């Protein structure tokens, strides 16, 4: 028997075009594929990170998102990853529900932090940005 592991980020026949695009962005972010990220996102994406979450504020443009938000967030942790497990298609908005997996130190145990991401999609299929809400208490408790 063939043991094939299927990831929630793999495309399935029932996925809409917009869900496929959001899944492609999560895969590109995970592999740090800058060319693909720039192809998927609009030129000036907006990351609206919930107040109370580390570095929570609104980031506009690639340099603020990747040179500001992610750089500051990653300086606080040893590892960080977003693992969506459900996608909901709302037309020009795709909601992803999942968990961040965070370790704060080299020897620390991973902590799971629930999140909801609402991704805006423009008329050309490019992602405009994200509205993020997460369980900040879990992040700070770790």
Residue ranges and their predicted role:
Residues 1-17, 67-142:
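A beta-strand edge to alpha-helix "cap/lid" segment located at domain peripheries
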Residues 1-43:
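Short, low-complexity N-terminal intrinsically disordered segments enriched in polar/charged residues
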Residues 34-92:
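A solvent-exposed, acidic/Ser-Thr-rich amphipathic alpha-helical stretch
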Residues 29, 35, 52, 103-105:
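Hydrophobic alpha-helical elements and their junctions with loops/disorder across both membrane
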Residues 12-15, 27, 55, 59, ...:
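A generic helix-loop boundary/linker signal
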